[in-house]
Amino acid sequence: ETNDQSILKDEDIDIVSIASYDNYHANQIIQAIENGKNVFSEKPLCLTHDEMLQIKKTQKENNNIKISSNLVLRSNSRFLKFKKDFQKGNFGKVFFLEGDYYWGRKKKLFGWRAEMNFYSIILGAAIHMVDLVMWFLDAKPVTVQVMGNDISNMKTKMKYNSFAVILLKFENGVIAKLT
């Protein structure tokens, strides 16, 4: 029995924080839910659509269990103020939002992310901006387009795109461009 399994079986523990490598998150989340633990997980919660469906199914079968993820920009004082001003209409009728997220790319091109069999800058970094815009607009995207490249990481161990541009069109008609 590994240390994480003994933690999950400990009846005195009500909540677990999952901060392992991305490719372990889904399995650990599912095990935690099955063992009656509330979950706070680093993102991404999972790497595949099938993993997402399994997490959703497991949580539905254990609907008293709560799952939360580390979408930290929502608690940043600058964005809390922006959201309040946004809701008051202080920016007029919004038709377009643009955001850039500097995620410390250089350091991550050589760390554990570069050695993974799969790493997504969308799930690991850009998700912060996607979540923030969805939160500001209180709307879901209906159209998503993404283009990326690996030019900046060509001489590194990183095997996947380290840059992406995301275009989102929301149900309320607003368009967002995120990098």
Language-model region placement:
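Hydrophobic residues in well-ordered beta-strands that form the structural core
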Residues: 41, 47-48, 67-69, 98, ...
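Predominantly a Rossmann-like dinucleotide-binding segment in NAD(P)-dependent oxidoreductases
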Residues: 73-158
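A short helix->loop->beta-strand "cap" motif at the edges of active sites that frequently abuts
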Residues: 35-37, 62-65, 174-175
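Short, well-ordered coil/turn residues at beta-beta hairpins
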Residues: 18-20, 136, 170, 174, ...
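Acidic-histidine catalytic/liganding microenvironments
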Residues: 10-11, 62, 76
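Active-site beta-strand termini and strand-to-loop segments that position acidic
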Residues: 159-161, 166-172
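Beta-loop-alpha module in the N-terminal Rossmann-like domain of NAD(P)-dependent dehydrogenases
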Residues: 1-58
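Rossmann-fold dehydrogenase core element
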Residues: 54-73, 92-99
